[in-house]
Amino acid sequence: MVEKGKMVKISYDGYVDGKLFDTTNEELAKKEGIYNPAMIYGPVAIFAGEGQVLPGLDEAILEMDVGEEREVVLPPEKAFGKRDPSKIKLIPLSEFTKRGIKPIKGLTITIDGIPGKIVSINSGRVLVDFNHELAGKEVKYRIKIEEVVDDKKNIVKEIVKMYVPRLSDVKVTIRNGTVKIELPEFAPFIPNIQTAKMAIANEILKRLEDAEKVSFVETFERKKETKEENK
């Protein structure tokens, strides 16, 4: 069985009321009409049993072997939680005006970092539900443990992808306690990259016992001039 804290790569399909709402399978997403071009599909890496997936999935993963596929049905408390009436708030319309938001029924908004859905607008007040949209729902997952990641360089690469999915193929070297990560030229233009680099470094130092230092290398090469440019 998978040990707690081990990095594993998993694939999964999530269903609610018989409809697919989440998947790592690009073709299935397209077939079922939930494809998101901004998503990067394929197996994802997590640290087993550490709360990086739904509680019920975490429990199932710790009971599974590599290569095993399982179907699990999760009650609300082990999925997206029970519906909490206290998370349904009446907010003055003036608050939305102040924030430059035009409230529309059904619109998903974020207030103070918390996402919510507008339920109704009446008499200068807006009813917003801050429960997760799947709160109170039973969900079903098909999950497969694709592999356990043991190689240190691959662990580092997967940690980088966890925080910045666009950095899917960085070069990693590990020598004398230093983990060196070579970033592509476009890396400095990724939003919040400095914060992500700090989080990546902290995660690596936490996971690799013999790592003492993490360095990020950004290399910019001289562009070769074409014959057209030299004319």
UniProtKB/Swiss-Prot annotation:
Domain named PPIase FKBP-type: residues: 5-92
One Pfam family, short name: FKBP_C
Record's keyword terms, sorted: Chaperone, Isomerase, Rotamase
Enzyme nomenclature, EC number: 5.2.1.8
Region (IF): 83-134
GO biological process annotation, one example: protein refolding
Protein role: Catalyzes the cis-trans isomerization of peptidyl prolyl bonds and accelerates protein folding. Also exhibits chaperone-like activity.
The family this protein is said to belong to: Belongs to the FKBP-type PPIase family.
Protein name, UniProt field: Long-type peptidyl-prolyl cis-trans isomerase
